[in-house]
Amino acid sequence: MTHQAHAYHMVDPSPWPLTGAVAALLMTSGLAVWFHFHSTTLMALGTVLLLLTMYQWWRDIIREGTFQGHHTPPVQKGLRYGMILFITSEVFFFLGFFWAFYHASLAPTPELGGCWPPTGITTLDPFEVPLLNTAVLLASGVTVTWAHHSIMEGERKQAIHSLTLTILLGFYFTFLQGLEYYDAPFTIADGVYGSTFFVATGFHGLHVIIGSTFLAVCLLRQIRYHFTSEHHFGFEAAAWYWHFVDVVWLFLYISIYWWGS
Amino acid sequence: MAGRHLLRACTALRLVNQNVAVRPLQRTMGTLKGIPTDDEQATGLERRALQALKKGKDPYSMLRPMEYAGTKAEPHIVPGISTKRLVGCLCEEDNTAIVWFWLHEGDAQRCPSCGSHYKLVHSELPH
């Protein structure tokens, strides 16, 4: 049998990039159909296809790396570069919304009353639930670091406990933000204040949910003995993403909740 | 009828299990704290690459290649799995024109452009 003389992974042909592209097509055209013809069928079909694609693609990566041993040190290095570049692109995504916020708030227009917060907007008290949320996310950053050290030191029980705690803190944040959204005295339709507030915090909340899901998958894998004390890049990637989510919140809190109030 | 078969299978299984020694719920690894090491669990190409590195070998060329003087006394050592291998010589740093030539087993050959020496050394295909 011919074996390769290099350490890289020549991936087998896979249908998931195609199904992912089809899902993107169905979701976007489905969005247009929803707008014009009041039917959500196409969009829902696209979403289901997207979820199936993500599940099967990432399941295959776990099979290739953990079960088949294709993730040699050079391959792992490439995955690290990939995750860092992806998170960097997400940083730029949020940068745009911060730009919008500062554009609107540094020079408030006469329509807003020439002031920030705009006339008629009752802002949320930054020292109530938002401060609690800050503490929750910072604590989750501590617990995820605890989980990482537990894995590196071979401590299975501690790794599972600290990772579970991190996920619970993530859920608590999402729950508290949900309550805040429900009880907020302003909506997304309330001028540029509402727009910048809910789009920025809304996308952040979505990223918290994505990060929590990533960590939950890591918890499942840790319970099933996928990670070794030296090789656990899936977990490291989840932890990086979680720290990124935490940092974005800190910027949101300081800019929108505190300075902007 | 399917229910009767299922019941028979369950009772048979229970009888079999009673004769087997009870296994501890937590899998014991070499590391008693419960998380395996690469040495215990790495598999496939990753395992082969890591085990080779531990023995000081690099069959998958993961490390930076060794540097040689390229003189007659110290030629560039080129590992090869066959009787010949392509060599690309950058005669000077930052050269954009690569000098390509086949290096055959036997005596060291010289680059047709800069004259540095190359010697093909047979090595096994990693498997």
From Swiss-Prot, chain A:
User: Which first-to-last residue range defines the signal peptide?
Assistant: none
> A single Pfam family, by name?
COX3
Root EC class: translocase
Question: Per UniProt, which keywords does this protein have?
Answer: Membrane, Mitochondrion, Mitochondrion inner membrane, Translocase, Transmembrane, Transmembrane helix
Q: Name one GO molecular function term.
A: cytochrome-c oxidase activity
Where in the cell does this protein reside?
Mitochondrion inner membrane
Q: Name one GO biological process term.
A: mitochondrial electron transport, cytochrome c to oxygen
Q: How does it assemble?
A: Component of the cytochrome c oxidase (complex IV, CIV), a multisubunit enzyme composed of 14 subunits. The complex is composed of a catalytic core of 3 subunits MT-CO1, MT-CO2 and MT-CO3, encoded in the mitochondrial DNA, and 11 supernumerary subunits COX4I, COX5A, COX5B, COX6A, COX6B, COX6C, COX7A, COX7B, COX7C, COX8 and NDUFA4, which are encoded in the nuclear genome.
Annotated function? Component of the cytochrome c oxidase, the last enzyme in the mitochondrial electron transport chain which drives oxidative phosphorylation. The respiratory chain contains 3 multisubunit complexes succinate dehydrogenase (complex II, CII), ubiquinol-cytochrome c oxidoreductase (cytochrome b-c1 complex, complex III, CIII) and cytochrome c oxidase (complex IV, CIV), that cooperate to transfer electrons derived from NADH and succinate to molecular oxygen, creating an electrochemical gradient over the inner membrane that drives transmembrane transport and the ATP synthase.
Q: Which protein family is it in?
A: Belongs to the cytochrome c oxidase subunit 3 family.
Stated name of the protein:
Cytochrome c oxidase subunit 3
Species name: Gadus morhua (Atlantic cod)
Lineage at the top is:
Eukaryota, Metazoa, Chordata, Craniata, Vertebrata
